[in-house]
From Swiss-Prot:
Species in which this protein is naturally found: Arabidopsis thaliana
Coiled-coil boundaries: 345-369, 396-430
Regions of compositional bias (Polar residues) in chain numbering: 28-40
Protein name: MICOS complex subunit MIC60, mitochondrial
Membrane topology: Multi-pass membrane protein
Gene that encodes it: MIC60
Induction: Accumulates in the mitochondrial transmembrane lipoprotein (MTL) complex during phosphate (Pi) starvation.
Main location (coarse class): mitochondrion
InterPro entries: MIC60
Observed phenotype of the null mutant: Altered mitochondria morphology leading to the presence of several big mitochondria with a round shape. Altered lipid homeostasis; reduced levels of digalactosyldiacylglycerol (DGDG) in the mitochondrial transmembrane lipoprotein (MTL) complex during phosphate (Pi) starvation, associated with the accumulation of phosphatidylethanolamine (PE) in mitochondrion.
Positions on the Mitochondrial intermembrane side per record topology: 96-549
Keyword annotations from UniProtKB, A to Z: Coiled coil, Lipid transport, Lipid-binding, Membrane, Mitochondrion, Mitochondrion inner membrane, Transit peptide, Transmembrane, Transmembrane helix, Transport
Compartments in which it is found: Mitochondrion inner membrane
Length: 650
């Protein structure tokens, strides 16, 4: 993963840009050193370089050393040896105190452009041309801009300021040269002083509970390898092999530096961590430039002398500043990854909050619409109940009015009948009295003719009495016929009226045909009544659609397809020119005509004959039966009225 990150950083180097306040403050250093071909190395000596001109931005031209086979082999062997010594020292816990110092106090982000450029310059200046091709493939480094936790939470931006070139003194730069004067070699120490505005809370380490990867940043870069006395000078660059090994070692080790310390490192546990990496690398700004350069030399001397005194043979290795650079660079990469994840989480939370607000607004709108629809439904329900109440009240009022009207008519008819009966009785009584008086007078006058006259009067009396009785029975028969007609017009049961008529016929018309007619009335009409002509018309209109549908289905029934085709065919209406073809529409037309003429029996017979042999025969059977009952009852009523009329005339 580290190799992938290094390659990505290298590929993004071309699109990076320098901040506006750092564009004119980049500085480049070059130096040369002379060495003889004898192969003996002297102690490292610093050669001061004059201050670079502030007005000139372009770096001075540097003549690269001639590529030699021996030089390349020395660089490769020295790099491998330093990397192995560094790994051994790291695994044994010798570097814990330095790692703890580096990872605890870093709180601001590293400037990616400055770090990348310094690595490239050191790479091109220190690596010979023979080795440069192999190191360029794996040594490309790029760092992404990072934002610390304090900047993400508080929105504070920290600017990285470099010292102007005019303020840099020659004491800031040291060079390693050998005592050999015949073979020229060159090494470059590129140092940059970075001033970071850090708050007091960050300087004092106010957040110990935060991971060191989040708050750590690399603040300085030192590309100088200090050789051990007696060895040839070796320039160590940020090569891909050492970086890869160190990254694997760091990933395999625990994150907490204190956990790496062994019981044997009792002295190292007592060492206090410095305030920041700037103080450790002597890169923090001071009042005087001379004191800074002297402290750099002392620090290098102490570090050089500390390495030979490390525990056992494996710890006797080079602890160069390049190792710290790699660790700082790895810590910066981890911090960038952590910070990028933190920023992604913030962006995701913001988008989630926006979506939540959007859906909450939509939910509120939907709830408001739902409440409006509920209110509308309640209003419509109230109106419907009110209309139902009005309709029920109107129906009840009409029923009461019709019942009152019927009662009034019945009372009027009974009163008229009673008056007519009383008049007839009075007339009969008067005639009887007069007849008796005449007979008595005739008996007094003619005793001889008394017996004859009495018989004649008796015969006349009996004749008139029979006439009066017959007249009275005819009146009762007419009243019964009227009552039967009224009951049939309402569709009510006629059993009561039939019983009354049979009572009237028992005394005078025992042998008449009326008894047979009344006994032939259907039992359903007597007990339940018959439908009126209007009701029969309404029921037939209701049956028309069903009649059209079931007339196309055989008596045994059909499946879903038969019913579907019958439904479609029944919905299509065609005007039939010839009504004698026996189609369902012609049958319906004939029945309508018969109903309009009042011929119920013919209508029932026509309908029954028209739907015979189809499924509709079962549907119309009830209507045909009711129509025939009505027809029979009306025929009996017509016969009764005709008989009463004939009797009254004779």
């Amino acid at each position: 993963m580290l190799r992938k990150s290094v390659l990505e950083l290298s590929s993004r180097l071309s699109i990076k840009r320098f901040p506006r306040n750092l564009g004119a403050q980049r500085f480049h250093l070059s130096s040369s050193r002379n060495a003889s071909t004898s192969g003996k190395n002297g102690l490292p000596g610093a050669k001061p370089v004059g201050k670079p001109d502030a007005s000139k931005v372009d770096p001075p031209k540097v003549t690269p050393p001639p590529p030699t086979k021996g030089n390349s082999s020395k660089v490769v062997i020295g790099g491998v040896a330093i990397a192995g010594a560094f790994l051994v020292a790291y695994q044994t816990g010798y570097l814990d105190q330095y790692l703890g110092k580096e990872q605890q106090k870093l709180s601001e982000r590293i400037h990616s452009d400055a770090l990348t450029e310094k690595l490239e310059e050191a790479h091109h200046l220190n690596v010979p041309s023979g080795v440069e091709d192999s190191t360029e493939k794996d040594g490309k480094v790029e760092t992404q801009p990072q934002v610390t936790h304090s900047e993400a939470s508080e929105g504070v931006q920290s600017d990285i300021e470099l010292q102007p070139e005019s303020d840099l003194s020659s004491d800031r730069f040291t060079y390693i040269s050998s005592n050999q004067e015949e073979t020229p070699q060159e090494t470059v120490i590129d140092r940059a002083e970075i001033n970071l505005p850090i708050s007091a809370s960050e300087d004092s380490g106010a957040k110990p509970d935060m991971p060191s990867e989040i708050i750590s940043e690399a603040e300085s870069v030192k590309l100088e390898a200090v050789p051990k006395p007696g060895d040839s000078p070796i320039i160590v660059n940020a090569q891909s092999s050492s970086v890869h090994r160190e990254s694997e070692t760091e990933s395999a080790s625990p994150k907490d530096p204190a956990a790496l310390k062994t019981p044997e490192d009792g002295i190292e546990r007592e060492v206090q961590l410095p305030g920041s990496l700037l103080k450790e690398y002597n890169l923090e700004g001071s009042d005087t430039e001379s004191t800074g350069s002297s402290s750099i030399g002392e620090q290098i001397t102490k570090e050089t002398e500390a390495f030979p005194n490390s525990t056992e043979g494996l710890k006797d290795s080079y602890m160069t500043e390049d190792g710290k650079l790699v660790l700082d660079f790895l810590a910066a990469i981890h911090a960038a990854e952590k910070q990028q994840a933190h920023l992604d989480a913030q962006v995701f939370a913001e988008e989630l909050r926006a979506l939540k607000e959007k859906y909450e607004n939509e939910l509120r709108d939907l709830r408001a619409r739902e409440l409006m629809r509920i209110e509308e439904a309640a209003i419509l329900d109230k109106e419907l109940k009110r209309e139902r109440t009005k309709a029920a009240a109107a129906i009840k009022a009409i029923q009461e009015r019709m019942e009152d009207k019927l009662k009034a008519e019945l009372e009027q008819k009974e009163t008229e009948a009673q008056l007519a009966l009383s008049k007839a009785e009075e007339l009969a009584k008067a005639e009887m009295i007069s007849t008796i008086a005449k007979e008595k007078a005739a008996q007094i006058e003619k005793m001889a003719e008394a017996d004859l006259n009495i018989k004649a009067l008796s015969m006349a009396f009996y004749a008139r009495s029979e006439e009066a009785r017959q007249s009275h029975s005819v009146h009762k028969l007419a009243l019964g016929a009227l009552a039967l007609d009224d009951t049939l017009s309402k569709g009510l049961p006629v059993q009561k009226e039939i019983d009354t008529l049979q009572t009237y016929l028992e005394g005078t018309h025992k042998d008449s045909i009326l008894g047979l007619v009344l006994s032939s009335l259907p039992e359903e009409a007597r007990s339940n009544g018959t439908d009126t002509v209007l009701q029969l018309n309404q029921k037939f209109d209701t049956l028309k659609g069903t009649l059209r549908h079931f007339s196309l289905i055989p008596p045994g029934g059909g499946g879903i397809l038969a019913h579907s085709l019958a439904h479609v065919a029944s919905s299509l209406k065609f005007k039939e020119v010839d009504q004698a073809n026996g189609g369902i529409e012609s049958v319906i037309k004939k029945v309508d005509n018969y109903l309009a003429e009042g011929k119920l029996a013919e209508a029932a017979a026509t309908l029954e004959e028209g739907v015979k042999g189809s499924k509709a025969e079962e549907i119309v059977s009830d209507w045909v039966r009711r129509a025939r009952n009505r027809a029979i009852t009306e025929q009996a009523l017509t016969l009764l009225q005709s008989y009463a009329t004939c009797v009254s005339l004779t």
